């Protein structure tokens, strides 16, 4: 059936990403010289340590995809001169490769971009791979050797992982709290069916960054008020969306991804599973007098209750329908990740990590917004992915709320 050796069939939670040919990319902005040969050697070592990423996907007769080993060597590092006026987008093809690495050379910064198929890795997984790549690169530059290589098995599907942890699917999903909204309001029609493309295209993204001081102030505000940083950020996003939607009487459905690795016992390694991610839900009923601390506290309380009930753990067993946007009859969803903090990454002494961002690539149009939040180099970054109107207006409103909160609540930093 397949010309190469089949590693395994994709699980249900992974298949949705194959059908949309979805890749996620992380880009590290580095200042300082980059040795191309050393980066290429580090990438080769990374693929030897994680050989599944040297494979590709093939569609079976039933329409489902399989991970199939490649008979040929991986194409390796792609080097682009970013000083040229135009550069073509990297060609992503799941039938050829599940991991591409691109080095873009610039005047003041160089960009190291890792593209990984979403069927095999979520953001946490990809971040770990990029960290390992740069660590091995540092070893090659400083010692001439990329370090020990112990090949890892293919990561487990979330379904298998959760089954081994005793997690079972229940009848409840968390979306029940949105049912009172179903066809309850006069809402504009949802966009027509999403356009499909032959090959993955980069999804539009708009971004804002707080300064390191603004980020530190916000962290202090959250801690001093007994709130999680994630909840404060979620409350700011909800308040900004509520103000700009101009439908003050309509509650807002909020959905956010939850990394289950540290919520399971025993904890799950960064590269042990493909997408061990649950989905938490919250129904925001906001008015002119809604206080950000009260809203954030209610988000935390709802999350803890759903976590205690096992709702969030078992949500990873369900379909990726949320990737297709808001169902008919409901107000537009807000989709968001929890904040991920990039740990210090090893680099040679003359190389400095100065920025970090992500991008989604898939073979369909994304006519809804998806927030991705992270802290790197001590600065909060908020990305808004999707083909939506006025994304910068939303991000500016969120930033204004986040930057004004510490002073409004009495936290002044010198």
Curated annotation (Swiss-Prot):
It is an enzyme of class 2 (transferase). Keywords: Acyltransferase, Lipid biosynthesis, Lipid metabolism, Transferase. It catalyses: 2 a mycocerosyl-[mycocerosic acid synthase] + a phthiocerol = a dimycocerosyl phthiocerol + 2 holo-[mycocerosic acid synthase]; 2 a mycocerosyl-[mycocerosic acid synthase] + a phthiodiolone = a dimycocerosyl phthiodiolone + 2 holo-[mycocerosic acid synthase]; 2 a mycocerosyl-[mycocerosic acid synthase] + a phenolphthiocerol = a dimycocerosyl phenolphthiocerol + 2 holo-[mycocerosic acid synthase]. It comes from the Bacteria. Transmembrane segments: none annotated. Catalyzes diesterification of phthiocerol, phthiodiolone, and phenolphthiocerol with mycocerosic acids, the final step in the phthiocerol, phthiodiolone and phenolphthiocerol dimycocerosate esters (PDIM) synthesis. Can directly transfer the mycocerosate bound to the mycocerosic acid synthase (mas) onto the substrate alcohols. Monomer. Interacts directly with the acyl carrier protein (ACP) domain of the mycocerosic acid synthase (mas) protein. NCBIfam families: PRK09294.1-4. Consists of two structural domains that are related to each other. This is Phthiocerol/phthiodiolone dimycocerosyl transferase. The gene is papA5.
